[in-house]
């Protein structure tokens, strides 16, 4: 379900402070965050976030087509190792 327009997009306050500092200083350093729930805003284009996926920090470079999505969408938390292979059936026993 979409968020109400009157509420506006959600960004954690500590992440917003880091964004403001980076824009003020014109700094391109990686912004480290655990806040996967923060929405990507237009002012963050060109910045790189290190988003925690539960085990490590995944670097996410913000582009135009990411606006409106959440940071966590670009840092997968699960690794897929593939489905188990079916073992070859044993040769039929002879009578």
From Swiss-Prot:
Example GO BP: ribosomal small subunit assembly
Domain of life: Bacteria
Keywords for the protein's UniProt record, in alphabetical order: Ribonucleoprotein, Ribosomal protein, RNA-binding, rRNA-binding
Pfam families xref list: Ribosomal_S19
This protein's record includes keyword Ribosomal protein: yes
InterPro entries reported for this sequence: Ribosomal_uS19, Ribosomal_uS19_bac-type, Ribosomal_uS19_CS, Ribosomal_uS19_SF
CC terms in the record's Gene Ontology section: cytoplasm; small ribosomal subunit
GO MF terms, alphabetically ordered: rRNA binding; structural constituent of ribosome
PANTHER family cross-referenced by the UniProt entry: RIBOSOMAL PROTEIN S19P FAMILY MEMBER, SMALL RIBOSOMAL SUBUNIT PROTEIN US19M
Family membership noted in the UniProt record: Belongs to the universal ribosomal protein uS19 family.
Its biological purpose: Protein S19 forms a complex with S13 that binds strongly to the 16S ribosomal RNA.
NCBIfam families xref list: rpsS_bact
Stated name of the protein: Small ribosomal subunit protein uS19
Annotated source species: Bdellovibrio bacteriovorus (strain ATCC 15356 / DSM 50701 / NCIMB 9529 / HD100)
Gene name linked to the record: rpsS
């Amino acid at each position: 379900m979409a968020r109400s327009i009157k509420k506006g997009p959600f960004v954690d306050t500590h992440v917003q402070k880091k964004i403001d500092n980076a824009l003020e200083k014109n700094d391109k350093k990686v912004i480290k965050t655990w806040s996967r729930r923060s929405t990507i805003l237009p002012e963050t284009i060109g910045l790189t976030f290190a988003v925690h996926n539960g085990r490590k920090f995944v670097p996410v470079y913000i582009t135009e087509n990411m606006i409106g999505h959440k940071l966590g969408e670009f840092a997968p938390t699960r690794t897929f190792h593939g489905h188990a292979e079916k073992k070859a059936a044993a040769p039929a026993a002879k009578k």
